[in-house]
Structures are given as C-alpha cells and as structure tokens.
Amino acid sequence: WARGVIVNSEITSPSNYRSFLHLDTWLKKNKIVGITGLDTRSLTNFIRDNGAPKGTVSFSKSGKFNIKKLTNNTIKWSGLKNLDLAETVTTQKNYVWKGLKTWKKNIGYKKNNKYSFHVVAIDYGIKKNILRYFSDFNCKVTVVSCKTSAEKILNFKPNGIFLSNGPGDPAATGRYAIDIINELIKKNLPIFGICLGHQILALALGGKTKKMKLGHRGANHPVK
C-alpha cells in the first residue's frame, strides 16, 4: 500500500462511468493520509534534479502537530534499502484466481471458464490486473506466498512460473527468493517476472541491482 497521497487540486466527486467509490472515501477506508494544494509539478522537478527526498505527510484531528518529532522521525528513516516489504504484502494463503478477465466496455469483468495453461504466480505484491490479463490468455493462475518452497510450487504441476511485482529492496527479498527461483530454474520451466520479480530473477541469474538515483515516473521506463 501507498502510505500517503499528494495531489495538486482538491479531490472532487468522481465522474468516470467506471468509478464505484470516491477517492476521498477510499483513502479514509484504507487509512491512507492525503494532502491537496501542493505544487506537484515543482515537487516532480525537484525529485528529477535531486533524487527522491525523505518526507512526511501527517494528519491530526486537532490540527496540532509536533513538528520536531515528525522531523526527527523523518530524518531517522533508513529508506528502502535492505527492507523486505514483499513479506508484508504477500498473500497469507494460496488461492486460485477467480478467472475474471480484463475490463471491456459494455461487458465489464467477464469470467473465463476456459483454461489452456496453468501458471503459478509467486506473490511479492501482485496487482489484480496482471491476473486478469492471464485470464485473457486462458491461463488458470494459482497464487502462492512469496516464501512458498520450490517443491510445493512444483507440486501444482504448472506450465510456467510468474514472479510478480512488489515493493521493497530486491536484494532483501532475494535473501530467501533466490534459492527458491534457482530450484525452479533447474526444472526448465518457463519463468518470467515483472518489476520486483524481474529484478529477483536477475539476481538469481547472477546479476546485480541498485536503486536508481532519480527513479522513473509514468511510462518512461529506461531500458539499457
């Protein structure tokens, strides 16, 4: 989960025909703090030129804040390096995706009852829309916890393995994930990953990862 949301304009009532919940309501429901009225373009330019800074977004019902305490907590935050956040967001129980496909106009989320392939997805923080795309391609998807052993994964007799997206430092998650992936590689099954999963696969194959100074935003993902 995101811990905070920063937007320029005030959040207004939704008007998109696909909308089912006001963003303000969703933030409150999930206890995510938000703030409006910030010059987000200026903030983006600052991040572009200086890298991502530490920062705090805080809420107080009384409107009073202990600035010194908030500042000290921000300064002390160690950042994402060496943080295994995947274990905090992974599924606690293995499950089979319910088969809903990607959204189509005038149809919505149609269920797929036709399966040609079986994919085991290792969940490091998987997005539902990725699962929907698997359904588009007639894949049955079994989602397992990030610490599930290679033996248990292979017991599902999958046609392929998917390593999902997720938060945190890939090297930290790799402390347990690399051994699992290396065991799966030995079985010559098709394996691919997205985002964090892709980075962990690279680590398993002897590559190195490091945090980008400026990161990337939107669709501008650099490839070298």
Predicted regions and their residues:
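Cysteine-nucleophile active-site neighborhood
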Residues: 160, 165-224
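RNA-binding accessory domains that recognize and position tRNA/RNA substrates
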Residues: 1-156, 168, 180
